[in-house]
Design a protein with these regions (language model features):
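Walker A (P-loop) phosphate-binding loop of P-loop NTPases
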Residues: 447
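P-loop NTPase motor core of the ASCE superfamily
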Residues: 108-113, 511-567, 788-900
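Hydrophobic positions on the alpha1 helix immediately C-terminal to the Walker A/P-loop
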Residues: 453
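P-loop NTPase motor domains
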Residues: 35, 42-58, 72, 255-256, ...
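Conserved lysine of the Walker
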Residues: 450
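Extended, folded cores of ATP/NTP-driven motor/assembly subunits in large transport
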Residues: 1-387
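Pre-Walker A adenine-sensing motif
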Residues: 421-433
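Hydrophobic anchor at the beta1->P-loop junction of P-loop NTPases
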Residues: 442
């Protein structure tokens, strides 16, 4: 039997086969990104099986579904979007250069066929309703008929999206352009070699499918080869002659995860009418029972039991029956390579629980199977090798898989995967104005490539951020800092230096609970904890009270010396309180209201002035006298201070010494004595005591802590804590819509700060509202694991960048917060060390992104450019050599290019 290929038309986002009339068919496709289960637990595989059974159940008698799966190297759309983002947002030479290097490298790999990507599409095909053209219903207009089918496809799409969207999949209804491009790719395997910029230029909706996409005949191959030659490629066809005897979830991976490209799987599925099937089986059972009564053969008894069980299974709805046709096509420019592919595919089929593949010897049969696999065409008249199968078994052999690509469609950074794929990640997620920062933690041992990975991610994402703060030790980021801002030098934090960061300076913001917590925590670190826990609590209470009294004193001083300004501030405080209550949510703080009203004033000056003026003098006076209002007014005063006007560490120490009285007088004097070494005349100079002289005006601030000796661990912890709070105020003053980020070189140091847990948690949660992304680095996981900041850091982080680990117990501990499948745990333990790799070196890590549905887990390989390695390497010998080589360059990027 020789068939002719089907023809039809694209229009109104559907495909019409054989005319929109009785005997015709109408289809629509859906582009599907299957849930990425490569590193998932068995529970997720079982859940996918259940979802696929539900998908099959949506088919009504007479309707058919087709699963189209193929593998190629097409990352064109995502790479072009990445390039467009570079052109649009990257103003920095270094970021431009590194992003362009990745784009060019990946584009070349794509054109050379070195990349691999699986694609999955679903097609639903419905017969055109014959009654629509009959006398009983009257003749429907073409548009009305199409509208009816479009609505049915729309509902199917909503169902499929709801089904797989909850487990991390994505479903996109295909348009006319999508249908055309799928057919063009399907019928023209040489299309990628033609380097056509926009295939849609060739789309003519007035022409049929064959006129648009079918540009050559198939001709038979000479024996002993089977199949046909078409579009410069040799094609071979296989079909499943017998299906697996038993199935399990992910069984189809044996076919979809082969290590080569250019083959496709097509599964045509037809639901069986259960009532008719039961009736037919009942008749068969009656006949077999009669034969058994006559012959008494054991074989007939077994057949009776099988048929009875089948009838019972279908009658109680335990299973649903389907018919399916499973077609495999492979193509290659070489006959020998095609034979090798077909051999590998046959072996893969055999491994699927004793399934068997059939290779048609006749070119006519091969063509018929080819025509039966055309996209959307599941009603071919070629009835060979259709099989009856139950729903769960059908679900397990469907090629429902796709390549793990992470967040590639909206990637801010891109890396290689482990199977020829590209993987993307992002620091913000959401849609439109609802983008939120996805705080991250990177964990890795020494030599795992942690520094190179961190700087590479910072480089690729730099175009999207307005400000970067780095607190590090070891000068790992010193060269990168200069690539962002040529004038930026590391801010050296050391004892007895000239750097001063006043921890009592609110940096132009009102006094807030968050600032008070930090301002009390730092002196508490300075005085240390007592072995007596009650005495420690007393110290903290006394210090908090003293800090509050100090702010009270300075606020009164301001009110007495700036009476006119104080009156205006009272009106502003009253207006801010009303603004928060009337226009902001119940969770908004006074600080939130201050920042939002400031932006509101800049954008709507007249309206803001009117809002301030609406309160009369008596209302303002009453607000200022009220206890809560007076507190808000006191806090607002500090937003008007100049750096030299703020209280300083020395003032706190003097207050404790001068006002020591009552039952705790001795303790207060003792605290004053303990705080004295931290004053300007003490052991650490002006670092904590004096007028702030660090001005954060550029795009990046790099604080270097390596000049503080390891023996001064408390000083290093205090400095890191001070930096975090100092830059936090700067970020909160910037426009909220701009992205900012904090990079903490060793976040475990915050554990040494009393109340460090509280401040880290509040900082993470509070700064999320101000578009601040945090990246915390952990090298000493043992110290981090036992600290009290582990909870707030991991609890507020959505991304885990997991480098090579050497201690399995650390990975198990991480699983308490980030449920890590056993397969991923094994992979993390075996990530290679970059320095021990032979040939091309790379830093491999696991990208774990939590989601409200389920975690996204992919493996990334950072094949860094020579320039990136030169910039980011932190080894001692390389550091000294690089410093000498770059010394003479005003433009550090030019120096990197010249010496890399």
């Amino acid at each position: 039997m020789r068939l002719e290929p089907v023809d039809g038309y694209f229009g109104e986002d559907v495909i019409v086969f054989e005319g929109l009339n009785r005997g015709g068919y109408i289809a629509r496709g859906f582009d599907v990104v299957a849930p990425d289960l490569e590193n998932a637990d068995p529970v997720h595989h079982n859940a996918l099986e259940s979802d696929l059974v539900a998908l099959l159940a949506v088919l009504k008698p007479g309707q058919r579904m087709q699963v189209q799966w193929t593998v190629n190297s097409d990352y064109r759309r995502e790479l072009l979007r990445y390039r467009d983002d570079t052109m649009k947002f990257a103003k920095n030479e270094w970021s431009q250069r590194q992003r362009n290097e990745r784009f060019v490298r990946y584009w070349r790999m794509m054109e050379e066929g070195l990349l691999r990507r699986e694609k999955l599409r679903l097609y639903f095909t419905l017969p055109v309703d014959g009654d629509a053209f009959g006398a009983r219903r009257g003749r429907l207009s073409t548009s009305a008929l199409l509208s009816a089918y479009q609505e049915e496809f729309h509902q199917l799409g909503l169902f499929v999206n709801a089904l797989f969207g909850t487990s991390g999949g994505r479903v996109h209804p295909m348009t006319d352009a999508d249908h055309f491009q799928h057919y063009l790719e399907f019928l023209n395997p040489s299309l990628p070699e033609q380097k056509i910029t926009d295939p849609l230029e060739f789309f003519d909706p007035e022409k049929s499918i064959q006129e648009n996409c079918w540009h050559g005949e198939c001709r038979p191959l000479e024996k002993p080869d089977t199949g046909f030659y078409h579009d410069c490629y040799y094609h071979g066809m296989l079909a499943l002659k017998s299906l697996p005897k038993h199935t399990r979830p992910s069984l189809a991976y044996l076919l979809t995860k082969l290590g080569f490209r250019d083959y496709a799987l097509t599964v045509n599925i037809d639901p069986v009418d259960v009532e008719r099937l039961i009736e037919r089986e009942q008749k068969e059972l009656t006949r077999v029972e009669g034969d058994y009564e006559s012959l008494r053969k054991v074989k007939l008894l077994a057949a009776m039991k099988t048929k009875a069980a089948k009838i019972a299974r279908y009658s109680n709805g335990e299973n649903s029956p389907y018919r399916l046709q499973y077609i495999i096509r492979a193509w290659d420019k070489s006959r020998e390579d095609l034979r090798a592919k077909l051999t590998a595919l046959k072996a893969a089929v055999s491994n699927m629980e004793r399934a068997q593949a059939y290779e048609p010897a006749l070119e006519t049969s091969a063509r018929n199977f080819f025509y039966s696999s055309w996209p959307g065409w599941s009603f071919s008249r070629y009835g060979a090798l259709w099989h009856d199968y139950d729903d769960a078994m059908v679900a397990n052999i469907l090629p429902f898989s796709s390549t793990p690509v992470g967040h590639l469609d909206q990637a801010e950074f891109i890396y290689d995967g482990t199977n020829g794929n590209l993987v993307g990640g992002r620091t913000f997620c959401g849609e439109g104005n609802s983008l939120t920062p996805q705080h991250a933690v990177t964990i890795g041992t020494m030599g795992s490539g942690k520094s190179v990975n961190a700087i590479d991610i910072l480089t690729q994402t730099e175009p999207f951020f307005a400000f970067t703060m780095i607190a590090d030790e070891g000068c790992s980021y010193s060269v990168y800092t200069r690539t962002v801002d040529p004038l930026a030098e590391p801010i050296i934090v050391q004892a007895n230096g000239k750097l001063t960061m006043n921890y009592l300076d609110t940096r132009g913001l009102p006094l807030s609970g968050l600032h008070l917590s930090a301002a009390s925590a730092l002196p508490m670190l300075m005085v240390g904890r007592s072995q007596d826990e009650d005495r420690t609590k007393l110290r903290h209470a006394l210090l908090t009270n003293a800090v509050n009294r100090l702010y009270d004193d300075f606020a009164r001083w301001y009110a007495n010396h700036h009476a006119d300004k104080y009156t205006l501030l009272a009106r502003r405080a009253c207006a801010l309180d009303a603004y928060r209550r009337e226009r902001m949510g119940p969770q908004a703080t006074d600080l939130d209201a201050f920042i939002e009203f400031k932006e509101f004033t800049q954008e709507h000056a007249d309206e803001a002035a009117g809002f301030l003026a609406r309160f009369n003098e008596s209302e303002v006076t009453q607000f200022a006298k009220d206890a809560a209002g007076a507190q808000q007014l006191r806090n607002l005063v500090f937003a008007e201070f100049q750096p030299a006007e703020y209280p300083q560490h020395g003032h706190l120490q003097e207050l404790l010494a001068a006002e020591a009285s009552g039952s705790h007088a001795d303790e207060m004097r003792y605290l004053a004595t303990l705080l004295e070494p931290w004053s300007a005349n003490g052991s650490y100079g002006e670092l904590f005591d004096g007028v702030s002289n660090v001005d954060l005006v550029g795009k990046i601030a790099h604080f270097e802590l390596s000049y503080i000796p390891e023996s001064a661990e408390e000083l290093k912890a205090a400095a890191a804590f001070l930096i975090a709070n100092y830059t936090r105020s700067h970020m909160m003053r910037m426009p909220r819509g701009l992205r900012k980020r904090n990079i903490f070189g060793e976040v475990a140091r915050f554990a040494l700060v009393p109340s460090g847990r509280k401040v880290v948690r509040e900082s993470y949660e509070q700064l999320r509202k101000y578009n601040v992304w945090n990246l915390a680095e952990v090298q000493n996981y043992g110290q981090f694991k036992s600290s009290d900041i582990r909870g707030p850091v991991l609890g507020n982080s959505r991304i885990l960048l997991l480098q090579r680990q050497t201690d399995r117990t650390n990975v198990e501990d991480l699983s308490k917060d980030f449920p890590i499948p056993d397969a991923v745990k094994d992979a993390v333990m075996s990530h290679p060390e970059p320095e021990k790799l032979v040939g091309q070196k790379y830093a491999q890590f696991t990208y774990y992104h939590t989601d409200e549905r389920r975690p996204l887990i992919v493996t990334m390989r950072n094949v860094a450019s020579r320039e990136m390695l030169y910039c980011a390497s932190s080894s001692g010998a390389h550091y000294d050599k690089r410093a000498k080589e770059l010394k003479g360059y005003a433009n550090v990027v030019e120096g990197i290019i010249a010496n890399a």
